[in-house]
Design a protein with these regions (language model features):
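Catalytic-core "active-site belt" of small-molecule-metabolizing enzymes
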Residues: 1-166, 170, 174, 182-209
Length: 209
């Protein structure tokens, strides 16, 4: 699956409480950015090295969808999404704050190596079934984030149509759909567990190096 991934799109501020916790305005249309493919790393129980000299590294837990084929107008989510994962959109928060102040793009804060963590991909059960289960992150055994796509400001259909219209959307693209409230910093040797419906589908530890 990983070798087939082409573009990595991310939706910012897509849960109202998360936007508020960072003192951001709630968007009136989808707010998208991207990450380079070099940022992608699978969470297979290994240690992931993150920068230790650029301020705090925050976790942002998200449902990630995988696009199965070229988008055509009128396509529904269940037609175009074949699998899903739980991911971490890791963010250099201090760097991001500086970039915001300068009104510069976020790439340095969002696109660094290993900043797009992703669990194993599992079959996508459909939107309705997906809304019946929560995704969550456990840090050192404690649940620190929990979310459900029912709470998205912009639902999966809107995200897919917006992304396709503005950037194109095809086979192998993935979309990080947004993080709920509860984001926070990572520390050296943190143990992370990515969960779907209470079951772990990815894990890793952190090495600050």
């Amino acid at each position: 699956m990983m070798k087939d991934i082409k573009n990595i799109y991310c939706v910012g501020r897509n849960y109202a409480l998360h936007a508020k916790e960072l003192n951001n305005e709630i968007p009136t249309s989808p707010f998208l950015f991207s990450k380079p493919t070099h940022s992608l790393v699978e969470a297979h129980g290994q240690s992931i090295t993150l920068p230790s000299n650029q301020g705090s590294v925050h976790f942002e837990t998200e449902l990630v969808i995988h696009i199965a084929k070229q988008f055509e107008p009128g396509m529904k989510v269940d037609e175009i999404v074949d699998s899903m994962a739980i991911g971490l959109d890791l963010t250099l928060r201090d760097v991001q704050s500086q970039l915001k102040q300068k009104q510069h793009p976020w790439l340095l804060a969002k696109g660094f190596k290993n900043s797009a963590v992703v669990s194993d991909f599992i079959p996508f059960p459909g939107v309705e079934a997906c809304e019946q289960l929560d995704f969550s992150l456990l840090k050192n055994g404690e649940r620190v984030q929990v979310g459900n796509i029912k709470d998205l400001l912009f639902d999966l259909q809107t995200i897919i149509e917006f992304t396709a219209e503005h950037f194109g959307l095809g086979k192998g693209d993935i979309i990080y759909t947004g993080t709920p409230s509860g984001v926070g910093p990572l520390s050296d040797q943190d143990q992370l567990s990515l969960n779907w419906g209470g079951n772990e589908i990815g894990s890793c530890s952190v090495t600050m190096g």
